[in-house]
Amino acid sequence: MGFPPRCIGQKIPEGLHVRMNLETGVTEAKLISNDKPKNALKMIEDESNNFPEKTSSESENRKTSYKNYEELKKDFNELNLNPKTDAEILRELIEKHVDISKQKDRDEEEILTILEDLEFLVHQYDNANDFVKMDGFKTIVYHNLNATNSEIKRETLKLLGSSMQNNVNVKIHALETGSVDILLRILALDTDMSVKYRALFALSGLLRDFPYAQLKFVENAGLSVFSKLFESDNLKIQQKMLTLINDLLQEEIDSKKDTKQVEKIKQYEDIQLRKRLIVHNYCDHLNKMIVNSVVIEANDHDIIERCLGALYLMVDDCSSKLTDKSKDIVLSLRNLYRKLSQNESVDGDPDYFGTLYDLSNAIVQRIQKIKVEL
């Protein structure tokens, strides 16, 4: 279902929900109400946008065309323009989902519509908290993740991931109710790669900026699950795992910059992510990713940047395990980006290739230094 863009300066009617889509940068609006006539907004729009110029005779008779208060009240009641709060809509959607789920021949298209509406709402912080308080995880999320319909599972995982974005209260609830194990089981066992992809999206929302969840992830064999996925042929999910690992490693580095956050620093140290990655053959996976990023996605500089970034964060640990082919590729990339930085820009950014040159050059220099030290 598409959403109409919000026009600048346009007043948003009551009951219309608006959000910024962080993936596209587009402002989206959606009318979420099961009891409004479908043409209600159109009726309002027609009333407000189609005022003909008044003739003198029309002006003279204007008083006689006015409707009294009772008539106006009746007209508005017919439109049913009594806006509901987000909390009321959330509760109605949850109750409707529960009712449909109990039916023997349940309407799965209706369930998908409900999940879409809920996902739209939980992007807002307070709505996500209300979703938790209304037992939405148990009655909807965990219930649907046992479904056989892959589309329902995908939409449910999207709902789960969206509810946890930058919301520590929801993350805590997800962790305490077993989300880590559930998501890892999906990543390990589900045969639909699109479901795995959404599970990784939800897992990323849970782990970022939440060291205690990261600890539970590694303690529950999360890196073993990742290692198996790195051995698969799905480059898309491997790139997402690489990005998540990069972010978690960077979090640990950043935590040490604030010496006052003693407890937070200790939490990251307890995870021992870097050491655990080495045990789970992460250096070998990086070798493979570096080669594939050039061979398979030679013109996708964003993917290459992720691989270089991952290697930069782990170069001290992985330098001795890099293959000659990987080292040659990094050297070639350095030469390529030196030339491109002198001649081209990307989307008006003249420093894009310069940044990639600096990154690849730093890796080369570090590898050479480690070799000399050995």
Regions found by a protein language model. Give the residues of each.
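Buried hydrophobic core positions in alpha-solenoid tandem helical repeats
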Residues: 93, 97, 139-142, 182-186, ...
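Residues that form ligand- and interface-recognition hot spots within folded domains
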Residues: 135, 221, 230
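Short loop-to-helix capping motifs
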Residues: 124-125, 166-167, 210, 317-318
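Recurring C-terminal helix/loop segment of individual leucine-rich repeat
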Residues: 129, 172, 212-215, 275
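Alpha-helical solenoid repeats of the armadillo/HEAT superfamily
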Residues: 2, 7-73, 102-119, 148-162, ...
